[in-house]
Each structure stands twice: as C-alpha cells, then as structure tokens.
Curated annotation (Swiss-Prot):
The modification 4-hydroxyproline is found at P18. GO terms for molecular function: toxin activity. The keyword Magnesium does not apply. This is Alpha-amanitin proprotein 1. It comes from Amanita exitialis. Belongs to the MSDIN fungal toxin family. Disulfide bonds: none annotated. Pfam families: Amanitin. InterPro entries: Amanitin/phalloidin. Residues 1-10, 19-35 form a propeptide. Processed by the macrocyclase-peptidase enzyme POPB to yield a toxic cyclic octapeptide. POPB first removes 10 residues from the N-terminus. Conformational trapping of the remaining peptide forces the enzyme to release this intermediate rather than proceed to macrocyclization. The enzyme rebinds the remaining peptide in a different conformation and catalyzes macrocyclization of the N-terminal 8 residues.
Length: 35
C-alpha cells in the first residue's frame, strides 16, 4: 500500500497520520475536515 500512502497522504498532510494506510481512503473523506 506504499503507492497509496505516497499519493494520498501528501495531499492532505503527511504529518497528520503517516500510519494511515488502508483507512487513507476513508480518512480523506471524513479526516479531511479533522486535519
């Protein structure tokens, strides 16, 4: 899942939750507001 992390995380903030992998998709939907 490295590709997802390298492609998604930097978009909304890699410093927010670098441990997020499979949940990155869900986090982007709801976590976007949290960050």
């Amino acid at each position: 899942m490295s590709d997802i992390n390298a492609t998604r995380l930097p978009i909304w903030g890699i410093g927010c939750n670098p441990c997020v992998g499979d949940d990155v998709t869900s986090v982007l939907t709801r976590g976007e507001a949290l960050c």
